[in-house]
Design a protein with these regions (language model features):
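Active-site helical microenvironments for divalent-metal-assisted chemistry
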Residues: 1-205
Length: 205
């Protein structure tokens, strides 16, 4: 797992004025909140928030977004409360985390195109701050990068959600590189044989 020192080094490369003490505090807070939790891959759970933060650091996002990434699952998956987050990190970060949590709690009722479109609109409407969507997209991207650790039925369900909801959202926000990776990762699950066939054809050209 990437250390806080390495994260700070990366942030300093584009934002030397960030409050690095608070970023370190959010890292340690998230680590302790998720202590004893593991991902399906067997990795400690906090690896996931750190990887989400790294995706957003690569996009050179502000420190509040990075802190939100490190804390984004604390309300949903630990005993920490929104009030505790606000007391520790202020209203801006706590509201961002709350926004990500609310999006996570939304469930897709249908994968038909018209319903998927309504769901995307609901995502946009609920996200008063675009940074909430950015954290959610980074969250989904890392989950898709590690999807092979899940049972196949969950892989298929999440890949369909990603193809119908998250990849188009990334495109609408101008994140074409993220849209393309989300689509590719979904396609690998949903149509792996067809994808391999296409790759083989290109290789033989």
């Amino acid at each position: 797992m990437t250390s806080i020192e390495e994260l700070i080094k990366q942030i300093k490369s584009y934002n030397s004025n960030a409050d690095f003490d608070l970023i370190k505090k959010s890292y340690n807070y998230g680590f302790n909140a998720h202590k004893g939790q593991y991902r399906a891959s067997g990795e400690i759970y906090f690896t996931h928030p750190v990887e989400v933060a790294k995706i957003l650091i690569d996009l050179k996002l502000d420190e509040s977004t990075i802190k939100t990434a490190l804390l984004h699952d604390t309300i949903e998956d630990t005993s920490r409360s929104l009030k505790q987050l606000e007391l520790a990190f202020g209203k801006e970060v706590s509201q961002l985390v709350d926004g990500v949590t609310k999006l996570t709690n939304l469930e897709l009722s249908s994968l038909e195109t018209k319903h998927a479109e309504n769901f995307r609109k609901l995502f946009m409407a609920m996200s008063k701050d675009v940074r909430v969507l950015l954290v959610k997209l980074a969250d989904r991207l890392h989950n898709m990068r590690t999807i092979k650790a899940l049972p196949i039925d969950k892989q298929i369900r999440k890949s369909k959600e990603t193809m119908e909801i998250f990849a188009p959202l990334a495109g609408r926000m101008g994140m074409q590189f993220m849209r393309e990776e989300l689509e590719d990762l979904s396609f690998r699950v949903l149509n792996s044989e067809a994808r391999n066939s296409i790759i083989r054809r290109f290789i033989t050209l």
